[in-house]
């Protein structure tokens, strides 16, 4: 959040349009982008025009169907997710805190429009899709896409598969972000 707030204060010298600030992240970065969006709303700024969440972890305290069914053999395992969660919050008992698990926020109303991309064979798929549903229910404009045949991390491998390249450059991400921050 502090980096985003700093960027907003430095937008003019950097030649940025403060009406078109967006946050984006994949995996843990998607979790952080969701959290930054929540903090920006709760703290009265900076105003964000868009959030892009690519296979985000949104519930470190839960156990979704995809987490159970895809817990092994799909690049990202449930054991790895638990370990990442422990590194993130330690043994503080904060896994259910909405700033750690955005899906558990009491309200998502007033957040910026979002693109949420999930991967078919990702243990985090269901919680990412549940977050998109909660955003939509809160009146937030959402583009939500499940990338069929994809594993967690595919956006970091755009040349590994034509599907990843298409998702990033054309279908979901490029079009949504262009509408939000460029046009």
Predicted regions and their residues:
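Alpha/beta-hydrolase superfamily serine-hydrolase fold, recognizing
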Residues: 1-183
């Amino acid at each position: 959040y502090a980096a985003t707030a700093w960027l907003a204060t430095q937008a003019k010298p950097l030649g940025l349009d403060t009406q078109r600030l967006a946050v984006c992240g994949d995996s843990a970065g998607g979790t952080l982008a969701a959290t930054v969006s929540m903090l920006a709303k709760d703290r009265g700024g900076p105003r964000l025009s868009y959030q892009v969440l690519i296979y985000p972890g949104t519930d470190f305290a839960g156990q979704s169907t995809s987490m159970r069914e895809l817990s092994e053999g799909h690049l990202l395992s449930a054991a790895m997710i638990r370990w990442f969660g422990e590194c993130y919050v330690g043994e503080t008992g904060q896994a259910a805190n909405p700033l750690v698990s955005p899906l558990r926020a009491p309200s998502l109303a007033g957040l910026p429009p979002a693109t949420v991309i999930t991967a078919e064979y990702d243990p985090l798929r269901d919680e990412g899709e549940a977050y998109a549903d909660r955003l939509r229910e809160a009146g937030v404009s959402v583009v939500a896409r499940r990338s069929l045949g994809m594993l967690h991390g595919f956006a970091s491998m755009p040349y590994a598969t034509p599907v990843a390249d298409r998702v990033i450059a054309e279908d979901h991400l490029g079009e949504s972000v262009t509408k939000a921050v460029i046009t």
